[in-house]
Each structure stands twice: as structure tokens, then as C-alpha cells.
Amino acid sequence: MTKYAFTLIIFLLGLIPQHAVAQLPEEELFLTEPDADDVGRHFTPDIFRYRVCFKDKAGSPYSLERPEEFLSVKSLARREKFGLKVDEYDLPVSPAYLKHLRDKGFRVLHQSKWNNSAVIETTDTLGAESLQEVDFIASVTRVWQAMQKKEEDSTLDYLTGFPVPDLTADTTRSVSPYGPNPHQVAHLGVDSLHAIGLRGQGVTIAVIDGGFKCADRIAGLRGVNIVGTKNFVDTGDIYATSGDHGTMVLSCLAAFQPFQLIGTAPRADYYLILSEDRASEYPVEEDAWCAAIEYADSVGVDLVNSSLGYTQFDTETMNHTYQDLDGQTAPCSRAASLAASRGIVVVNSAGNSGNDTWKLIGTPADGRDILAVGAVDDKGLNTFFSSLGPSIDGRIKPDVMALGDEVWVYDSEGQLTQADGTSFASPLLCGGVACLMQAFPTMKPTEIIRLVKASGHNAQHPDNVFGYGIPNLWKAFVEGQR
């Protein structure tokens, strides 16, 4: 697997006053919380996790005639607005099947209604593998095993190993309200949308990511309307984690500190959802991602940004292959595609593998009817690291491009930092899409995506380097009014 966080050049600005953050509504919706000691047990030998897939949802007390029992009012309203019916995929995993697993002594960590699966943790590998013989279980696959904790070097980018130069901080005030590089908003035409009052108001965005360290205390994020948080890695505070990748991604979307940094959707509402485990690289993170996006659906979000991707893992036999990139094979890709079919616009980073042996997009960027975003530099050229397409079934990937080179973000210390990666191209584009969704609240997500692609500079000749190109979202807005 390749994780997509490229923080290269550290600059300075701003310290971090406190601000209150709204607590998550009590809408657990049958998603299992990890145990409090989960983090400490990550590195205990002889612990394994398995993905258990079920054949059906028999024995469930839930019914398609009573969807209010497992979906929020807002989630149901989104489906109704777009003429989408609740179906079997939306029914929770059978509680009877989960009880069977617990009665056998397994700890249930995650569950996915869309994949009809659960993740169990155990030291009993023979017992887990014998579940294959249970008549309602379709498959059992190992997705994680305990390992030694990885050493982290603070002088390196925490995921990619790029050295961070020791540069003198620049405390000068920017000339533009958008900060040191107004182009990072203007290249998508989003500044023009902002100028007419389209800043994401009324749109709810879920940010599925790694750590959101100190995102609740950074001055430039003080005004963000965070309506809820959720942690699918452990039971810790998402703001107290050691990682700040999610914080940097959030600043691309939601920062609002004029003459320092303004994001592309500073007036949207946000759920911050932690699914990425920095301690190791295993397929179980895809299961956490599925739980995260299903949670986002259940609370009624309109839009998802995910700057995560999965291809290669700590155990090579678990790696994905190109044949998996069909939008339906990897669990997270299936979940992304199903989210799209439920009226959610999913925006995902294409990946940073363009210059390594993999070269291709990752999962869930191969999802169907979503926007996979590659990275360009300030001159509009594709970056050396931006992942390539197509999907195995021949779909154009990436779908579109946005600035992913020397993007200005806030780090966990509240300093302005320049970062590289499709991780940052994705939220810049996602925020612009939120502005379009504000302008056209009844427009179907598939039509929003069509407008975005059609506005790309490469729309007449889409390829598997640029996709449909760099969108001009002002052009998309004008077209949408016709």
C-alpha cells in the first residue's frame, strides 16, 4: 500500500488558540467501537484479524419498510431527493451473525453492511479459519497481524521519507486574501464561485483521513463548522493523534484566515473521520475505510473527501494487483461505488505512485461514478508522482486533475507548510465541488460529476495521465445554469 502524504517544505504562520468543537450526534447505527486498549495491543505478538464475509443477512430484525431504524433523517432525505430507494445493501449486517462470532470468543472490530462483512480479532487462528465451515459464512480472509512498531524519524516526511529542508520561516502577510499562492484556488475557478457567495454553505462533507492533530486549535481552522467526529482506528481523540495528514487536508478545504489561507469550501459543514492506522499497512485499513464511508452515509453527508489509497501492504501476499482495479473487487472500492449510488459525491486522491514500480491509481480511486483526482504543478503539468490509469475495465483514470505540488496547508502547529501529493489536489477539488452543490442543490451527483469533467481543459481528449484535465468550475457553474 502507498499512503498519500507528501509534506516537503516547512514555512511558518499563526499559533493555535482553542475553539469548541461540536460533539458527534449519538447515531451509532450498529457500527462497532474498538476497545479502549486497542492501541496498546497493536504490537502484541500472535494477534490476528480476519475479514469474515457473510452469504446473506438472514435473522436480521431490520426491514426495508423501516429504514429510519438504521439511517438518519438526513440520509433518507438525500435518497428521496434523488429518487433513490433503500435496498438490501443498506440493511445492517445480521446481528445474529455478529452474535455467533462473539459467542465463539472473537472480538468484532468493524462491520460493513455494503460488503456484508465483519472484521474479527483473535489469537485463535485455527478457530478463525474454521469459520469457513459455517453455513452462513462465504469467506474468511486474514487482513492484519501484529508486528513490531515502526520507527518514525521526525526529520523525514512521516509516510514517504522525503527530507524536510530546514528553512527560515517567512512571516510576511500575503498580498492576496487567499494566501501565498492564490492560484491554488483560482486555477479551478473557485475564487469566482466564492465571489458570488458560493462557499459550500449547506453542504456536508465527510473527510476520511489519517490524524487530525490539533485541528481543533489552529487559528486558521477556528471557524470550521465541525458537526461530528468519529475514530475507526481506536478510541482515542482524533485531535490528539500523532499524525496531521488529515489536518493538512482539512485546511485545503476549510481554512479561513484571510491573507494567510482560505480553503475552497470554508462555509461547508464537516464530519472528521479517522480510518487510517499509521502503525502498519494491512488490508484491515480498507475495512476501516468502509466503516467510515458507511457511517458518513448513515449520518447524511453530501460529499466525501478521501486522501487515502491502498495498493501494497506489509505482507506482500496481501497486495492488490492491477486486476483488482475494477471498482468492485477491493472492499473500499466497492464501498465508494455504492456510496455514489446512494447520492454521495466521492472525491478521492488518485495516488502518488506515478514514479514507482506500481505507477497506477490505488483503491478506492478505481471506484465507479466517483472523482479520482491526480496532481499538476503550478504550470499545469502533471507531477512526476501522480498515479496513472486506466482501471482494469478500461475506464479513464484519473478523472480530473488539481494542484498537488507545493500546496499551502496548515500543519499541526498552525504553521503554513507547503505539501506535495494528490492528497492535497483532492480536497482542493472537493471544496470546489461543494460550491457547485450549493449552487445546484437538487442536481443529481452524476450530473455534478458530468459538469466537472466537461469543464476540464482535457475534456475533448481525455487520457489516462490527465483524465479530463483541470476543471474550470466557474465554467461548470455557467453550464449548469443552462
Question: Over which residues does each language-model region extend?
Answer:
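Hydrolase catalytic cores
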Residues: 250-253, 271-277, 360, 404-470, ...
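Bacterial Sec-dependent N-terminal signal peptides
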Residues: 1-26
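Active-site-proximal beta-strand/loop segments in catalytic clefts of secreted hydrolases
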Residues: 52-56, 122-123, 143, 207-211, ...
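Autoinhibitory propeptides
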Residues: 95-184, 192-194, 368
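Subtilisin-like serine protease catalytic core
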Residues: 45, 181, 191-230, 235-285, ...
